[in-house]
Structures are given as structure tokens and as C-alpha cells.
Amino acid sequence: MGESPASVVLNASGGLFSLKMETLESELTCPICLELFEDPLLLPCAHSLCFSCAHRILVSSCSSGESIEPITAFQCPTCRYVISLNHRGLDGLKRNVTLQNIIDRFQKASVSGPNSPSESRRERTYRPTTAMSSERIACQFCEQDPPRDAVKTCITCEVSYCDRCLRATHPNKKPFTSHRLVEPVPDTHLRGITCLDHENEKVNMYCVSDDQLICALCKLVGRHRDHQVASLNDRFEKLKQTLEMNLTNLVKRNSELENQMAKLIQICQQVEVNTAMHEAKLMEECDELVEIIQQRKQMIAVKIKETKVMKLRKLAQQVANCRQCLERSTVLINQAEHILKENDQARFLQSAKNIAERVAMATASSQVLIPDINFNDAFENFALDFSREKKLLEGLDYLTAPNPPSIREELCTASHDTITVHWISDDEFSISSYELQYTIFTGQANFISKSWCSWGLWPEIRKCKEAVSCSRLAGAPRGLYNSVDSWMIVPNIKQNHYTVHGLQSGTRYIFIVKAINQAGSRNSEPTRLKTNSQPFKLDPKMTHKKLKISNDGLQMEKDESSLKKSHTPERFSGTGCYGAAGNIFIDSGCHYWEVVMGSSTWYAIGIAYKSAPKNEWIGKNASSWVFSRCNSNFVVRHNNKEMLVDVPPHLKRLGVLLDYDNNMLSFYDPANSLHLHTFDVTFILPVCPTFTIWNKSLMILSGLPAPDFIDYPERQECNCRPQESPYVSGMKTCH
């Protein structure tokens, strides 16, 4: 049920009364002891001070054992006014009787009851301490053992009492009615912190100069009197806020460290797993090598045995043949020696003729009778040389990812739609292939944080974990180029160079080369390369009849005698503007060209939509933007509005930078590396380079790379003056 209106009004009035009483109590508090004034003195400066507190001030100013009688002055603790004392000392000061009466009435109004303003304030003051103290607090006045539990703590007495002792020691009469009673608190929290220099004083302010807790006497008469001090509450709030902020940062840092430690532990576990896998793989590979060696050993041993058997068989046959020949020769020799012993000539002649023929025949045919024997075939030409294999075995090691290649920017070349990238690597023998990755340079957005990819620099397709683009990789078209977001990938390159075709003209690209082998891959540092601008020539079909175009289509000259050209809707036809246009329409990329004006003093150079009027000077409509000169005046013009441009003297060449993608058209003085002006244009149609002259000639240099002093797409200061051209009203004379 809701409260009655009377109780609501009563509660509201009670709260208002409590607020007023709290405010009054702060006015009745001594600045030294921070308690209600007791026997207050009225100082000449109109402030008040407890008699005992004033006495402590005088005592603190004396040396040890010295009397306070010689002291004739002290400072007011509130306003620092010097209070002079007569021969009576403190007794010579007036008592503030009115203040004492107010304090007595205030104490009567705040006696007993938790809703009294003083009680509420005291409870709030000690509530945090009470909340923190959940232990049992015993009565400090009980004589029995063990003492009873305390029900109240007297702040004035600095003692905790049980209910019986509280009634006995604090009757409802003066001076006990002014004692502050709170819920029981530990004695350590009750007494608070005392001053280091004044042992009987509690700290109640903070010295900022010394970064130290002090009491009021330290500020009045102590060594902190000239120091900057602050209230405990202000210092408490400031330090608490700082500590909370630092604690928040520390907790955040700890959380980050915990995450990093978890990742490190995960990596350690992965190292253990990978190490075990590599060790098992090592044993497997070495066992296979040992098996291969054993097999080759057995095979070579068999071959040696077979060769031995074959050679011994052949030699045994040769020995048998030699033995047979030897036996035959021995028989013939014996027969011949026997005939030679015959002394009878007739018998000798009869027998020797046959023997002599046989010996002569045996001697003549000795080469035929003795078999062909190879004495060098002793199995000496066979050798076992495993030195090459030993070196290979000695070089056995685990394969690591190749060193990152390096793009040779000085060797790279470009046209308006191609870039040839060259790179080198000091680890070519361990590289199985290269992979070329490239994308249009858009600034720091090309470099993705680790939250996208575990390798920090996108793309590392093979080892990417959390990149959102990985879901698109599965559906990417197969072929030479695989697109992941805006990156293009050219895989399986075997050479140290590659030419990329089909690029945008005048555009910067980021290139990364990845060296790959079975152990992994490593990227080169990203390199920025840019294509040249789109080359163009002057289109004869759009050229004014009174202009002459050179054979190479790069120079235009005023020629009054050239009137043979037929009129077409595309041709410039104004009577005061002799215009020409390039033979291209640009709808993307960044393009740069230069125009050599020579001695021409009347011209306009810029761009225009195809729909721009052909019978007036370019820049006088909303479809064209130009840089123009009329004699000594240089202006930029669009939609018939002009601004003067400060141009260096003798401007002979003008640089034009069209950044279609960033909606900018800029003009430069390339000879002095000076930026002249930039148009901010929201292009909605393709644009065409456009030129108009009134005298002399112009020459176009197209397909150029942007000079190094132009760091597009950053904006540069221009030399325009935002005021009307002095000859705007007389524009007809220029046209």
C-alpha cells in the first residue's frame, strides 16, 4: 500500500530539516578538532576557536619544556590573521557566548534517534567501515570474561559499549548527549590516523607539496605552513579517480596479457604437437633412407659376386687352354730332344724331318696355339665411390620456408595498362614457385590488421584463419587470376619476373611477391608501382576548321587559310574560339599530361563532357573546367565563373592531372614543381581533354607518369585568389 499524504509531507519536511541541521552543524564545527565548538573563543577577526584548540596551537609553538607565557601572538587557522595576546594570554580573549548557546540548542535538537541530522551524518561517515567489518566487536567496558557484544561505538570516547555498559556510562544528560554514537566499528578504524609530527592530532588535510597527510597544526605552525594543502575529500576523490582509471587500464592490460599468454600456451602446445610430428617424420624418412641403403648394399654385393663368378669362370677356361697347349708343346719338345741325341745320320735324317716340320709349325703358329689372355682383367676397374651420396647425406636437414624475395623497383617497367614486375631471391634453389599478388593502392586500408588475418598483411591465403574473405575464396573463379576482395593472385610463376595486363591507366598498385616451397612461404615487402597515363592525340573530327593538326596529332596551330573541313556536330564551330579535343573519353583512373604553350598568349586548357557546347569557349558552361590565359591574366574558369591564379613569369608548360576516381582536376607548373589550382568535381560522365587557342600553337605531351612532386590524392595549396577576374565583364573581348 502507498504512503499517506500526511506521511509523505512529514518525511519530506523531515528530510528538509535534516539537510538544514547538517548545514548548521558544519558551521558549528571547529577548524582544528573538527568537532562542535567547546568553550569557543571569539577572535578579533570574527572567527571562533575552541579554547583547548587555541591552547594546543600555543603549545605546539613552544620548544620542549618551555612555557607558553612568552607567546604573544598566533595565527587564525581560518583566515591566517595574526591574533595578538595581552598579559592574560588566551584568558584575555572574549568568550563567544552566543555561539555556545546555539551549540547547546543544536545538541538538544539532535539528541537520540537515527534520523537526526548529526546521527545520519555520522552513520554515513562510518558506514563503509561498518560494512567492511563483519567480525564480532566486543564491548571494551565489560569486566566479565568474555565481554558482551558491542551495540554502539562512541566516537567521542573512542570506545565500543554493550547495551548495559552504554546505559551505565552515557546517561541522557549533559555532556553525554553530545557524544556521537554509531554502529560498532573496530578500534583500528575508530581511532583513525594520527599526525606524524603531532601524535595527539588526527590528520585532516593533505600537503600537496610534500605529498603527505598532515593535521591542522602542521599547516598553522608546523613545517607545512607555507605549503599548498588540499582537503582530504578533494585529494581522496582525485586519487580514487586516478587509481580507478589506472586500475581499469591495468585490468585491461592483464586481460590482454592473459589472451596473449593463452595464445602463447596454445603455440607451445602446437610446438609440442608439431615437434612430435616432425620427429616421427624424421624417423620415417631416415628409416626409408636406411632401407634404401640396405637394398642397394645387397644389390651391389650380389653384382660383385656375380661378376666374380663370371671372371673366375673365364680365367679357369683360359688356364685350362694354356695347360692343354703346354702339354702338347712339352710332348713335342721331348720328341725333338730325343731325335737330337741320334748320332746315326741316316736315322736322324729319317726321323728329324717330320719332327722339324712339326716344331717349325708349332713355333710359327704359337700365337694361334696359345689363347688370347687379358692380364689386366683382374677386377681392378671396379670402384665404389659414394662421396657424392655422402655429401648429400651430410647435407640432410629439415626444409624451411624460403627467404622473402625483394622486388627490384628500378627494373620494373610500366605502360598505360601493363606493369612488369622484377624481383630477386637469395634462396632460389629451395623455391618451387612464386606467387604475385596485387591490388589498387587506396592508402592504409590496404593493410589489414591481425584480427583479419593471422599473418598481419593481407593476403596470406594459405594460412589465413579469421579473414572474412576466406568464405569468398571457395567460390572464386578458377584460372590464372583468383580474386579475394580487391586482391588479385597470379600463382605458379617459375621466373623472376611477370607482366600484368589489363590494368587501369594512371593508377597506383601494391605488389607483393610470395616465395613458396613445401615448408611454407614468405612475402616480399609491399611495393607501390603505377601505370602511365592513357596516351591520346588530337581528334581531327572535333578540331575547329581554322586549326591545323600536325601529322602526329600532338600539335595544333591557328591557320586562317584552312577552310576545307566540313562542318559536323562534334566539331568546334565558334567564331571566337578555336578548339580541339583529345581522341579519348576518360571515366576512371588518374591521368597526367602536359601542354607546351610556346609563345601563345590566348588559350584555355582543361576537360569537358561530350555534351559541352562547341560554339563557345570551354569553361563558360557547367560541362567544362579550364585553366586559361588572356594576355597577362591567368584564371581558372567553370560555369562562367573565374578566379585569378598567381602564376610564375614565363609559364611555358602546363601540367594537367585528372584524378577521376577522387573527383579532382589539378593544374601545375612542372618547371617549378608548383601547384596552381585544383577543381573539386563530382564527375557524372566521361570527360575529354579539351584545348582552345586564339593565337600561335599548342603541343600536347600525353601518356606521361605523374611527376614525383605530385603526391596525389593529397590536396595541396593552390595559388588562386577568390575574387572576380578584372576582365570578367569584358569577356567578349577575349572570345
UniProtKB/Swiss-Prot annotation:
Q: Which cysteines are joined by disulfide bonds?
A: none
For this protein, the Enzyme Commission number is 2.3.2.27
Q: What InterPro entries does the entry give?
A: B30.2/SPRY, B30.2/SPRY_sf, Bbox_C, Butyrophylin_SPRY, ConA-like_dom_sf, COS_domain, E3_ligase_FN3/SPRY, FN3_dom
Which modifications occur after translation, per UniProt? Phosphorylated on serine and threonine residues.
Q: Positions of the zinc fingers (B box-type)?
A: 137-184, 190-232
Q: Where are the zinc fingers (RING-type)?
A: 30-80
Please report the name of this protein according to its UniProt entry. Probable E3 ubiquitin-protein ligase MID2
PROSITE patterns, per database record: B302_SPRY (PS50188), COS (PS51262), ZF_BBOX (PS50119), ZF_RING_1 (PS00518), ZF_RING_2 (PS50089)
Entry's family note: Belongs to the TRIM/RBCC family.
Xref: Pfam families: ANCHR-like_BBOX (PF22586), COS (PF18568), fn3 (PF00041), SPRY (PF00622), zf-B_box (PF00643), zf-RING_UBOX (PF13445)
Question: Which reaction is recorded as catalysed by this protein?
Answer: S-ubiquitinyl-[E2 ubiquitin-conjugating enzyme]-L-cysteine + [acceptor protein]-L-lysine = [E2 ubiquitin-conjugating enzyme]-L-cysteine + N(6)-ubiquitinyl-[acceptor protein]-L-lysine
Determine if Metal-binding is one of this entry's keywords: yes
The answer to whether keyword Phosphoprotein applies is yes
**Keyword terms:** Coiled coil, Cytoplasm, Cytoskeleton, Disease variant, Intellectual disability, Metal-binding, Microtubule, Phosphoprotein, Repeat, Transferase, Ubl conjugation pathway, Zinc, Zinc-finger
Q: Which residues form a coiled coil?
A: 233-301
Protein localization: Cytoplasm; Cytoplasm, Cytoskeleton
Query: Which PANTHER family does the record cross-reference, listed alphabetically?
Result: E3 UBIQUITIN-PROTEIN LIGASE MID2-RELATED (PTHR24099:SF12), E3 UBIQUITIN-PROTEIN LIGASE TRIM36-RELATED (PTHR24099)
Q: What class of enzyme is it?
A: transferase
Name any GO cellular component annotation: cytoplasm
Q: Which residues bind Zn(2+)?
A: 195, 198, 218, 224
- Where does tissue-level expression of this protein occur? Low level in fetal kidney and lung, and in adult prostate, ovary and small intestine.
* COS domain: residues covered: 340-399
The B30.2/SPRY domain is annotated at 516-709
